Amino acid sequence: MRHVAIVGAGIFGLQLAIELNDLGFEVDVFEEKGVILSGSTSKSLLRIHKGLHYPRHLPTAKQSLRNYDSFVERFTEAVNANFNNFYLLMEKGSKISLKEMSEFLGALKSDAEIIELKQLAQLGINPLGVSLVVSNKEGVVDLDLLRELFARELSCRQIRINLNSKVREVTQNASEWRLLGQDHELGTFDVLVLATYGNRPIISGLSSVQPELMEYHRTLTLEVKLNIEKIGVTVIDGDFLTVLPKGFSDSYLIYGPTPSRLEVDIGTKVPERWLTSEWEDKNSVLINRASLTLMNRVKELFPESNPVISGNPLIGIRSVGVNLQTTDARESNVTELFHNLFEIHSGKIDHCLEVSRYLGRLIDRH
């Protein structure tokens, strides 16, 4: 039986572990934190959508659309889809025109509906400057319920989840991969998969792997209370705002491209300073300023909502390809860096089933 190591216990890493175990592989998952789903997965909006968020990149939109139903079916108990989502196109500041948006909707072939602008006021949304409103039934993932679901499924499988296990280095020994921790060896494996959302310093010493230039974002998402009907709103496509329910709770999560990107760095690995516990304290002024900007945007979008921050700031890290500003492409895919060494590029959580099935078959054929 071949032995696979997966580094990263986010939704992509865990779903792949289940896929491989069901195919007959021995699987170890290594997670540096003490709880599964506590990295990038936990610091995002946890949106699952049907592609409307990506009108400038049809392939990303179609990948989300074709995976939506299977994701909801797979994770039903952790998905809240009991609210309406609204996508607003602005007359000014958008990166696409009304004509381009209409063409995109036709090409995507989703079940989205264009609604009348006058309905915005009934929802408590400021209609000023809005040129188009599209309604779509979508959902969000409840993180606590997703953790419970995975914990239950992992407990009845022969999968070892190694928490508080930071992989410091990877070395190659013939056809095997040797994983090293802080002061001890973690094991030797036939196949290695990186599901670390672009954080790959552990393989920087491998001469067989070429470093890849990525754009890394230090991100801010806020949890807030809003006095509004339970809905989701995304203003597209530019530097606007997204407001979505937080799972099944009575809170909302908000994100805006420019204020939520606290720092941007282009390189071959995540900046070391972001990985220290002191980063948030040292950048408290930056975080507070960005939070204020986000709250002001919420007040502009929902004038009567009385927004109040209700949780600690969610500070995360995301990685995207370089020079993607024109299209905002976020496709998820797999790269084979070397024989039996794979890296998952995770664009959106709703792509995890497609990616894990593809990679499972690929490893099974090797």
Spell out what each predicted region is.
Residues 22-42:
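Glycine-rich FAD pyrophosphate-binding loop
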Residues 261-317:
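Flavin-binding catalytic cores
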